[in-house]
Amino acid sequence: AAGLISDAEMANILQQAEINTGGHSKIASVIPQWFNLPHQINATLPSILGDDTAHVLARAVQFFLPGEPQVYYVGLFNGKDDQDFFAKTKQGRDVNRHHYSPAEIDEAIASPVTQAILGLARLRTHAAFDGTFNWKQLTDSTMELQWTGKDSKLKLWFDLSGSTPAFSIKITDGTSSRSLTSLSELATI
């Protein structure tokens, strides 16, 4: 994170992750001898965020930013830290390497979070993503990410001020548009 955020901001993120994971992320994360902070947080994003809407919003931001979004299978399945696997191997990264049974995969794929993330993946093929990207920070807690194509536009608006974040994805094709504001609506894409 060097250069992207300050050490103080990173320490705050690590502290919040520790709180949200009941202290487990601190145990699983390794602090290199040459630095005072871990180089990565060994915990799953769903465990760190502790909220399904926050997790899907983080994925929406990821999908709206330029580049090729990548989602690890545990994140797609909304997987929480596998503390049992970590306890067995003592390898910090193993908290994010759950071995899913076929029944667990079926359950995860049917979940609202996974269906919403799959909807975002389908949306990423929209023609507007071949256009121009821009973003605006509206307030300390609200932002818009937007793609504008020849005949289409996609806009992600979100607000982080509440205990649960709010978001809206507006899809405009020609003269028609629709807005999606929930996980279940994202699943319909």
PLM features per residue range, with description:
Residues 1-189:
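Active-site and adjacent substrate-binding regions of carbohydrate-active enzymes
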